[in-house]
């Protein structure tokens, strides 16, 4: 198995630097006006952390880059939880305003190389439209988009370079118990229920339905956040891509 690991605090890691180089090489070969990187993975897998590190490294190299998160495009509570769909499919189909995310952010930049998005979106903490999302990026820049279920078949072709992060279900739950208690005020019982009944089975459904590994350029094991490991295709198929 091919492994590359390094600490991710402080100076850019070897892995982040390699990813940035691969992204720039791909961008040069594509010759597009707008270049979109997708960072996909389970909840608590480190998507935001990696996306920020990539933006920082690309910016250091003189490339205008911004991060956009699908978490800023949550649907209202009654949409996420009030559907007639089973809970597994509620997360998959109803968690995010994918129409606005794709048609307002991803597609405009991918096709035109210009992004001017300024809209008040839902703040899921209060279930109110008070979260102003402003995203601006011009021609020649790189948009690093991150979020859950990012590489769905319906719009995966809009991503020019795709990264899939992997963590085990046990690691995901352990991180969620800490994060959701500290940041979202959830009890241990609530967190365990959400992940066992909604998020874990939903991601398994996503792996079966959309096979994100098929379109990911790289798969990274983030079980140890300070030592991420780049997996080769065989190892990725064995540990990260099976539902």
Where are the regions that the model predicts?
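Conserved nucleotide-sensing/catalytic segment adjacent to the nucleotide-binding pocket
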Residues: 66, 75-125
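ATP-dependent NMP and nucleoside kinases share a basic, alpha-helical "lid"
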Residues: 128-182
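Phosphate-binding P-loop
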Residues: 27-34
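Hydrophobic positions on the alpha1 helix immediately C-terminal to the Walker A/P-loop
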Residues: 50
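Post-Walker A helix-loop "phosphate-sensing" segment adjacent to the P-loop in P-loop NTPases
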Residues: 56-66
């Amino acid at each position: 198995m091919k492994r590359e690991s390094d600490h991710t605090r402080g100076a850019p890691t070897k892995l982040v630097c390699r990813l940035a180089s691969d992204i720039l090489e791909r961008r040069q070969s594509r010759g597009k006006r707008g270049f979109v990187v997708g960072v996909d993975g389970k909840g608590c897998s480190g998507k935001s952390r990696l996306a920020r590190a990539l933006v920082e490294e690309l910016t250091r190299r003189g490339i205008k880059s911004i991060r956009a998160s699908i978490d800023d495009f949550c649907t209202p509570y009654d949409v996420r939880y009030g559907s007639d769909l089973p809970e597994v499919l509620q997360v998959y189909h109803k968690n995010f305003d994918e129409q606005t995310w794709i048609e307002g952010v991803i597609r405009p930049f991918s096709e035109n190389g210009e992004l001017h998005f300024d809209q008040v979106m839902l703040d899921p903490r209060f279930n109110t439209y008070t979260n102003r999302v402003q995203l601006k990026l011009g021609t020649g820049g790189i948009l690093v988009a991150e979020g859950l279920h990012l590489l769905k078949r319906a719009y995966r072709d809009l991503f020019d370079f795709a990264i899939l992060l992997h963590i085990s279900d046990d690691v995901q739950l352990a991180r969620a118990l800490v994060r959701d208690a500290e940041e979202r005020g959830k009890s241990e019982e609530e967190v365990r229920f959400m992940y066992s009944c909604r998020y874990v089975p939903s991601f398994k459904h996503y792996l079966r339905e959309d096979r994100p590994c098929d379109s990911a350029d790289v798969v990274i094991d983030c079980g140890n956040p300070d030592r991420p490991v780049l997996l080769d295709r065989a190892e990725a198929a064995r540990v990260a891509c099976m539902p």
